[in-house]
């Protein structure tokens, strides 16, 4: 096959006076007139020589081009009007054949003739397929142009449009609508996707993009929306965009921002990725019709994230945020992608609440979860303080229902509060490995047993102390003692869950030795068997190593880390919300009940993910640029966020925690041919993640210099330098050197 995109060597020079003045335009097969480019002839001829297994002698390409131009110039005298000197593609190709034969390159001429024949066949397949799918000439022309792009970008025989046509005809029947036919064409591309031909998924994505953008253009034309600034105004009037965007940016600024949009980046989507984005994330009318394109979605998010930047540099940050998103280098958290630019702009993904051991506190935590879920957040809930089954209530022994009953209420809340039908609520429930309800907890999602003790829509997670695994390693035939946290607090005067490490072990063994505390002895091997059985059947429980996490807590003076979030990725101090008082107050003739609460630490984390498969991870400068942009966007989320709960806002501003994760890890390795089970993998991963950590911390430090350190910086491991010492990043001489990050 010829490769017409190649350029001829720069030393080839044409006599402009003799030829170019006479051949100025070329008429394409679809009637379009383009500027004549002699180098395209040379590139096609070079390709023909290559197909024939020959290398053209020096000067041959120039001779062919000169012969072609001379013949064409003779056919169109210089005195003729410019439009009549526009020669057709077919005329040029005919003259190329004659020129090759005049020069004695018969095998090359034969290859060139075969090439023309193949191109004719491909054109016929494209034209026939486009005509069969589309309902009007404009639609057929647009589809044929897209199929031509597919041929050029995917030249391998396995991606021939003829394969698509064959599969399409097998999926269609007479009488189908144009939309159904286009759906069948997209489905045909999806079904052609295989291990041997994986890029059909990219082709399917392009076809889906074509259908979506044509429908969107028609819809917008009917609404009279012709520019991005008018689109923002229309969406704002409809209550689909937050008015804060128009308050922050002038129409002129919006149009300048819109100039950043690069439609070519739609080609980066796979079918599955684009379909998900169109279904979940682009703004739709109240009737469910899409009103913005994927690139406009990325720009809208960028505009929101850059709102509070200084006016002189704000649009520059808009462009940087747009670039990292539209190039798919960084993916913001689902709520940010979904809610940024909208009236209810809850941008954070993950929240953690500590459930207190009181009826009011438990229901407050469940209500908190409902509010978080309503706006797209996921939740981690620590139930380690809730008394176990058979515990006492107000001195009455054996009446407590335990944590399972409350988890079932949490489960039903997750199902009921489904984020406007977008997706079911998501929650992880955490319990300590020494809690008396642990055996039942481990069977929450298994398929056998009493269904009244099941909760299939939550994600159980266990908080393990080091002692548990140390004893398991020593001997699985030892007893492990399960206890009720309420009993321990009532008898010993301390909450066992409030400690970790050596202090926890000392207290745990003290409780085991105290005969006043009821205990449930379970063989370690039976407990481990339950854990493995549940993991094999359900993929849960998640594992959270509390001692390890608390040892490296950068804010140890501010509290204890009880658990993590839905994804087991956040490690941050948590504490329960406490009710202080409730009083009846009469003011100006209106009687109200005022409840006063102490907020505790209601953890919020603001997340983004580096797409390692799309980043040049070896390029330190490029990684630094992308990471700095992502960290700044995440820090902006904290201030721009809509908070459904005041507790969340207080904690988020106190700690300013951000989470920069990764995706596309296996993709990164596959691109580089790095085997999973290899030393090269380990050393490469270490290098990549050290680079990510370095640039993230450096970006946070620069933000602290610009905006100030977070509230709890004084006395933190960041301030003392212990953060780096605990991780082995400094020698003894540097252990006291601190850094002031914007986030804790």
Q: What feature does the model see in each segment?
A:
Residues 2-4, 11-744:
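Extended catalytic cores of very large enzyme megasubunits
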């Amino acid at each position: 096959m010829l490769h017409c995109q190649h350029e001829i060597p720069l030393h080839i020079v044409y006599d402009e006076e003799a030829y170019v003045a006479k051949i100025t335009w070329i008429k394409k097969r679809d009637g379009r007139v383009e500027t004549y480019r002699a180098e395209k002839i040379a590139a096609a001829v070079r390709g023909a020589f290559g197909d024939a297994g020959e290398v053209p002698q020096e000067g041959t390409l120039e001779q062919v081009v000169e012969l072609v131009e001379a013949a064409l110039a003779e056919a169109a005298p210089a005195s003729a009007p410019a439009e009549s000197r526009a020669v057709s593609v077919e005329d040029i190709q005919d003259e190329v054949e004659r020129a090759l034969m005049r020069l004695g390159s018969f095998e090359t001429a034969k290859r060139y003739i075969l090439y023309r024949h193949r191109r004719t066949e491909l054109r016929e397949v494209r034209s026939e397929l486009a005509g069969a799918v589309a309902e009007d000439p404009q639609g057929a022309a647009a589809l044929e142009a897209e199929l031509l792009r597919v041929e050029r970008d995917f030249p391998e025989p396995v991606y021939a449009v003829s394969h698509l046509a064959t599969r399409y005809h097998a999926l269609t029947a007479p009488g189908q609508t144009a939309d159904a036919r286009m759906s069948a064409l997209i489905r045909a591309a999806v079904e052609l996707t295989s291990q041997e031909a994986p890029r059909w998924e990219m082709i399917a994505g392009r076809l889906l993009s074509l259908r979506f953008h044509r429908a969107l253009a028609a819809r917008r034309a009917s609404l009279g929306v012709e520019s991005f600034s008018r689109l923002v105004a229309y969406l704002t009037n409809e209550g689909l965009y937050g008015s804060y965007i128009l308050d922050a940016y002038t129409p002129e600024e919006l149009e300048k921002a819109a100039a950043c949009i690069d439609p070519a980046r739609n080609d980066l989507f796979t079918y599955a990725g684009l379909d998900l984005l169109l279904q979940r994330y682009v703004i739709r009318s109240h009737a469910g019709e899409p009103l913005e394109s994927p690139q406009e979605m990325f720009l809208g998010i960028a505009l929101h994230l850059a709102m509070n930047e200084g006016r002189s540099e704000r649009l520059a940050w808009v462009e940087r945020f747009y670039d990292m998103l539209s190039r798919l280098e960084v993916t913001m958290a689902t709520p940010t992608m979904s809610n940024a630019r909208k009236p209810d702009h809850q941008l954070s993904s993950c929240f953690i609440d500590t459930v207190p051991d009181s009826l009011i506190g438990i229901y407050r935590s469940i209500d908190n979860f409902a509010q978080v879920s309503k706006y797209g957040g996921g939740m981690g809930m620590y139930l380690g303080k809730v008394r176990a089954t058979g515990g006492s209530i107000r001195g009455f022994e054996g009446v407590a229902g335990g944590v399972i009953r409350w988890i079932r209420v949490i489960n039903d809340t997750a199902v009921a509060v489904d984020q406007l039908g977008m997706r079911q609520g998501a929650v992880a429930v955490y319990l300590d490995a020494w809690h008396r309800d642990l055996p039942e907890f481990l069977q929450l999602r298994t398929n056998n047993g009493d269904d009244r003790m099941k909760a299939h829509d939550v994600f159980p997670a266990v908080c393990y102390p080091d002692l548990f695994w140390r004893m398991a390693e020593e001997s699985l035939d030892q007893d492990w003692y399960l206890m009720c946290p309420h009993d321990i607090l009532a008898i010993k005067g301390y909450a066992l869950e409030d400690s970790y490490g050596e202090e926890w072990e000392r207290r745990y063994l003290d409780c085991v030795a105290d005969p006043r505390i009821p205990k449930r002895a379970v063989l370690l091997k039976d407990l481990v068997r339950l854990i493995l059985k549940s993991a094999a059947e359900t993929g849960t429980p998640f594992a959270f190593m509390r001692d390890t996490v608390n040892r490296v807590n950068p804010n140890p003076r501010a509290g204890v880390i009880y658990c993590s979030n839905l994804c087991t990725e956040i490690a941050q101090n948590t504490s329960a919300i406490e009710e202080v008082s409730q009083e009846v107050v009469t003011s100006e003739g209106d009687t109200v009940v005022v409840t006063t609460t102490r907020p505790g630490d209601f953890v919020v984390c603001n997340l983004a993910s580096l797409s390692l498969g799309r980043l040049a991870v070896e390029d330190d400068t490029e990684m630094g640029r992308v990471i700095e942009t992502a960290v700044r966007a995440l820090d902006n989320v904290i201030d721009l966020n809509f908070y459904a709960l005041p507790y969340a806002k207080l904690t988020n501003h106190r700690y300013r925690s951000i989470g920069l994760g990764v995706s596309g890890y296996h993709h990164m390795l596959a691109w580089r041919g790095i085997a999973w089970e290899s030393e090269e993998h380990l050393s490469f991963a270490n290098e990549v993640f050290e680079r990510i950590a370095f640039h993230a911390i450096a970006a946070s430090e620069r933000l602290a210099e610009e905006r100030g350190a977070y509230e709890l910086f004084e006395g933190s491991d960041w301030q003392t330098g212990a953060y780096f010492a605990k991780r082995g990043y400094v020698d003894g001489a540097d252990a006291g050197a601190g850094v002031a990050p914007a986030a804790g």
